[in-house]
Structure formats: C-alpha cells, structure tokens
Amino acid sequence: MKILIADKVHPSAISGLENLGHEVTLNPACTSNELHKYLTGVEVLVVRSTRVVAETISKANSLELIIRAGAGTDTIDVEAASSQGIYVCNIPGKNAVAVAELTFGLLLAIDRRIADGVIDLREGIWNKK
C-alpha cells in the first residue's frame, strides 16, 4: 500500500508502517495548496494539521483512506471525501496524557499565582509575600 504522510510524525510510525510492507513517503513541508501534486498513486493519506479540501480530494485518483493523526476531522472535507468513496478516520485520545499534564500545570500556576507574579516582575515589583 502506498502511504503519504503530509505532516511531521514520530519516526517509529514510519518504520512501523514500512516493516509491515507499506511504501511510505514523508513530505512534512507539503502545503494544503500543493498536496494534490503528491497524491498520484497514493492509497492512504495521513495528515495532522494540513487541510484536505474538496479540490484536493477530487484530484486524488487512487485515494481510499484519509487519516487525521489527532482528534477531530475539522481539517478534512469529510463530505467531499465521502462523495468520492474515500473513508476518513481520526485517532482520538493519543494526546490525553499531554492534556492531563497541561491541566495539572495550569492548576499549579493558578494556585501559586504565577501569572500575577510575572506581571509584577515585568513592572519591576518584587513582592516577597
């Protein structure tokens, strides 16, 4: 299976797909406007934040699956893909640990009034209380 990854992904994801016998092309510099140029013969497209619009989908001659490597599919024209018989899926929940870490970090920042301290420091105030 020919796979195009149009955004940055961890190298282990690429090697894992290659070990399964897939032909993987990595092109993280590809923009939404030029994406259609790289889709010739591609069966699976993997994106993170690159937009996949109806015009791009209509030019994909062998595309069968679009994978959004993240939560949501808001960067993909799902209706256009469906009308072409192309499946669209996402990978929700992979960022759950990072979200939990951020939440606890923000709770600590609120509890310790870090933002208030930063504002004071920028104004030249050193309040030791």
Protein language model features and the residues they cover:
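An N-terminal-biased, well-structured beta-alpha scaffold segment characteristic
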Residues: 1-89
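Phosphate-binding beta-alpha-beta segment of Rossmann-like dinucleotide-binding domains, i.e.
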Residues: 84, 92-129
